[in-house]
Amino acid sequence: MDPGGLKHSKDKGLAFGKLSESSVEGSFSGDTGGSKSTTSTSLMHLPGSRPQPPARDSANGLNVTTTQMELSTGGLTIEEAEVKVMEKAIRMQQPQKPQQNQQLFENFALLEASIADLNRSNTPGSSVLGRPHDLFSLKTENFSPMDKDRLDMGSVSFGQSQKDLDVNERLLGDNTMDILQDLDLPGSLSDLNEFYVSDEAAFLSSLSVEDVLLEDGNMETKPIDCSNGGNCTNVDSADQQKQLLEAGVSMPVIKTEEDADTSFIQLCTPGVIKQENDRRSFCQISSLDLPSTHNSAGSISGPSYPYGANTSTAVSLQQDQKPVFGLYPPLPSVSDSWNRGNGYATGSGMSSSSFPVGFSSPKARPEASGSASSAPAKPSGPTHKICLVCSDEASGCHYGVLTCGSCKVFFKRAVEGWRARQNTDGQHNYLCAGRNDCIIDKIRRKNCPACRFRKCLQAGMNLEARKNKKLIRLKGQQTTMEPNPPPPDERACALIPKSMPQLVPTMLSLLKAIEPEAIYSGYDSTIPDTSTRLMTTLNRLGGQQVVSAVKWAKSLPGFRNLHLDDQMTLLQCSWLFLMSFGLGWRSYQQCNGGMLCFAPDLVINDERMKLPYMTDQCEQMLKISTEFVRLQVSYDEYLCMKVLLLLSTVPKDGLKSQAVFDEIRMTYIKELGKAIVKREENSSQNWQRFYQLTKLLDSMQEMVGGLLQICFYTFVNKSLSVEFPEMLAEIISNQLPKFKDGSVKPLLFHALNHDTMP
């Protein structure tokens, strides 16, 4: 019994506590995440040492008094003090009224004074842990200014009020002793290496807690919410989780453990990350799985374990306590920094091999591994085949091309309807309203049948492919029925018939696809015919045919590769050639060259040819149809010759893209030769046929020249009162000066001048 009437326990020793300036400042500011840089100073009471009053902190409003010395004579034993601590801790969890805060502060200060007085009377040779205090050296750390959000586990923050100022004065009483004031500690984290000693493992192991202590009955106090102006209320797990997520900080868990022989208070602080500059690696000492901020410096407190160690001495969670780390999302920055380092350092300073993935704690390993590992790839289903026409999902190979069912039916109806309308190969009734470049997809494939049919032909669809497929299937069945099958190479050759046509669309098939339909004139045959009315109707029909010819020319393969000025020049010079050649073909097909079939509803017979200004024109046009009858021109030959007429008149100065023009013209000359070979089985007559057809093309220059003179005369002579459509009038106005000054020239096949030969 000391003079103050204070009893000592039989286990006398030293007690450690941590007091942080950041926590003291937090008690006045009420903000744990402030921007001030704080440096924590460890306070230690050693037996036998004299108490030293701490420095007066006038900046924080602290006046050191002798309150704790006066309270040390209360006659309390350490067991009674701990019972009071437990009672106060339990009482702190219950809702308190603002007027009870003063009593709570006084009880807390009374405990501090009792422990301080007990430390003065302890003998130097005993400790709570059963070891002399001189077995390990003192190690302190100066936290870097980056640690702004760390909570100090040895203090409780309260709101800012005048009562708090008085209570905090007693917290730093005269009996509080700071032995670190005598030490001249460095101010940077890198200078602390000299304080680390070789027996650091002994220091860390001395702070370990045995499993027996953890298996006893533990009592916990929940974190206290003191953010409402100094009113401290306990919160349940749901409110605690909400406050933790809103505040973005980690709350400490204060655990009270009691043993039969030894009674002490253990403050388990959360594990944080200690950053070392060696090889950019990181050391993690974990006691509780509480997350820390990205910029927090390392500190060591409580039991220490090597990184990734799954030990049984970790702090056990009670049934009513939820894991604290479950309230926080995993921190990817910790794992990223571990992955960047070459390795890690354990708590004892031993270097271990590096791991590819780092975890904040063993308890969080399943979650971290689940989040770090990439999700298993979903088994990809069967790849969908795309229709080559409309890009829809293909249903199979139809007519030699991978297409959908809609395009299959469309192509079949288009080709069969085309053949049903004409006994021989003819033209379909599809006409593009645009520029023959419409987009054909799943949504817009029904907007333009002409472009859709052209795309089917470009993809290589062919009705003969279905027959060839059946032939291949029959051949395959016959080869399987043979007793001795031939070698694989011979069998593969036998499956392919020799007469199998090409699935790639030919130039002739494209020319058939883009050929314009016949245009009706709308002429009223019930009214008596006059030259003016008849010529006006023919001019109006010619204007419509010119528009159709422009669309047809733009759809020609290779024509749009020419310069735009060259395209306009060729159309202006050859529009009447195209109209006359088409008129001769229709007259040959429908009237066998006896009459002029301008349109299905307008046929010029002998009576109409006798009208004024009609005889000369009709005689020139009948010559063309007569040549068709004499030569029995096929449809394929007609299509190729029509393209060559478009390319038969050019300016004398040449075109801007002359090389491209020459290549295109030579291509269609070869196509004409292919059409001749397709028609004539006798190869000896092919060259003769080619000569006859090219002579017909040259004769078109003379026949159309006479028609142009009549057209120009009718256009200039206003007394005839012949109406010309706007587009046709514009073309004639541009073409007339060129023909008068002779700035254009024809391209002939059989001219005497070899310079004009192709």
Curated annotation (Swiss-Prot):
GO function term, MF aspect, one: core promoter sequence-specific DNA binding
SUPFAM superfamilies documented for this protein: Glucocorticoid receptor-like (DNA-binding domain) (SSF57716), Nuclear receptor ligand-binding domain (SSF48508)
Zinc finger (NR C4-type): 387-407, 432-456
Gene Ontology biological-process entries: cellular response to steroid hormone stimulus; chromatin organization; positive regulation of gene expression; positive regulation of transcription by RNA polymerase II; response to copper ion; response to cortisol
One of the record's GO cellular component terms: spindle
Region of interest called Modulating, as start-end residue ranges on this chain: 1-386
SMART domains per the UniProt record, alphabetical: HOLI, ZnF_C4
Low complexity composition-biased segments: 26-42
Feature: DNA-binding region: 387-461
Domain NR LBD: from-to ranges: 499-733
Region (Hinge): 462-498
Tissue: Isoform 1 is expressed in all tissues tested including liver, gills, intestine, skeletal muscle, kidney, heart, spleen, stomach, brain, pituitary, ovary, testis, skin and bladder. Isoform 2 is found only in testis.
Keyword Transcription: yes
Keyword tRNA-binding attributed: no
Cell location: Cytoplasm; Nucleus; Mitochondrion; Cytoplasm, Cytoskeleton, Spindle
InterPro entries: Glcrtcd_rcpt, NHR-like_dom_sf, Nucl_hrmn_rcpt_lig-bd, Nuclear_hormone_rcpt_NR3, Nuclear_hrmn_rcpt, Znf_hrmn_rcpt, Znf_NHR/GATA
Principal localisation: cytoplasm
Swiss-Prot/TrEMBL keywords: Chromatin regulator, Cytoplasm, Cytoskeleton, DNA-binding, Lipid-binding, Metal-binding, Mitochondrion, Nucleus, Receptor, Steroid-binding, Transcription, Transcription regulation, Zinc, Zinc-finger
One Pfam family it belongs to: GCR
Region (Disordered): 1-61, 349-382
Post-translational modification: Phosphorylated in the absence of hormone; becomes hyperphosphorylated in the presence of glucocorticoids. May be dephosphorylated by PPP5C, attenuates NR3C1 action.
Protein family per UniProt: Belongs to the nuclear hormone receptor family. NR3 subfamily.
Subunit structure: Heteromultimeric cytoplasmic complex with HSP90AA1, HSPA1A/HSPA1B, and FKBP5 or another immunophilin such as PPID, STIP1, or the immunophilin homolog PPP5C. Upon ligand binding FKBP5 dissociates from the complex and FKBP4 takes its place, thereby linking the complex to dynein and mediating transport to the nucleus, where the complex dissociates. Directly interacts with UNC45A. Binds to DNA as a homodimer, and as heterodimer with NR3C2 or the retinoid X receptor. Binds STAT5A and STAT5B homodimers and heterodimers. Interacts with NRIP1, POU2F1, POU2F2 and TRIM28.
Name under which the protein is recorded: Glucocorticoid receptor
Organism: Oncorhynchus mykiss (Rainbow trout)
